[in-house]
A protein has these predicted regions:
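Short Fe-S-cluster ligation motifs
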Residues: 48, 126-127, 138-163
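Short, surface-exposed amphipathic charged segments that create phosphate/polyanion-binding patches used
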Residues: 67-73, 120-125, 155
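FNR/FR-type flavoprotein reductase catalytic core
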Residues: 1-113
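Short secondary-structure transition/capping segments
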Residues: 24-26, 77-81, 106, 130-136, ...
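Local cysteine-cluster metal-coordination motifs and their immediate loop/turn environment
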Residues: 10-12, 89-91, 111-146
Length: 163
């Protein structure tokens, strides 16, 4: 298992790492990516659990100067690997592409503005690749927030709004 987080996307991953350690008897590898070293979170917490931590920063101020997707490619996930991703949409898209190309299973945890929290307002929808009527748009609040990355239509999302 490999956990990939961008910025505050790391928030729920310590709990996931603990669960994976308990259920699989092995600590996942963790990629922590951020714009700079001051934005890297939870590295010591993951190390204390026995996780191997890889740090990637956009400016090279900590770890390696590269994006999360490139770090994942260096780890060479394979068909027996599951990759868990949370962070900016563009990071999740590119990291998912690397995982899928390597034959790994990949899930993403999406974030969206959720006005109602029960799916009625449709404020948190993202497009899926489903061709079935009524399944083209999925609600992050009700259908997610965790999705198999192959179900998300990444090309339908305007990444420019995710800054």
């Amino acid at each position: 298992h490999i956990i990939v987080s961008g910025g505050i996307g790391v928030a729920t991953f310590p709990a996931l790492a603990e669960t994976l350690i308990q259920k699989c008897n092995a600590a996942p590898e963790v990629i922590l990516a951020a714009r700079s070293k001051h934005l890297i979170l939870c590295a010591d917490e993951f190390r204390a659990m026995g996780c191997k931590v890889h740090i990637a920063t956009d400016d090279g101020s900590a770890g390696e100067k590269l994006y999360a997707s490139r770090m994942l490619a260096k780890l060479k996930p394979g068909p027996n690997c599951r990759v868990y991703v949370c962070g900016p949409m563009i990071m999740m898209k590119t990291t998912s592409e690397v995982a899928i190309a390597a034959g790994a299973d990949c899930v993403v945890s999406l974030e969206a503005q959720m006005a109602c929290g029960d799916g009625a307002c449709l404020g948190c929808v993202v497009e899926s690749k489903s061709e079935k009527e009524g399944e083209k748009m999925v609600r992050v609040c009700l259908d997610g927030p965790v999705f198999d990355t192959t179900l998300i239509d990444w090309d339908a999302h305007n990444m420019a709004f995710d800054r």
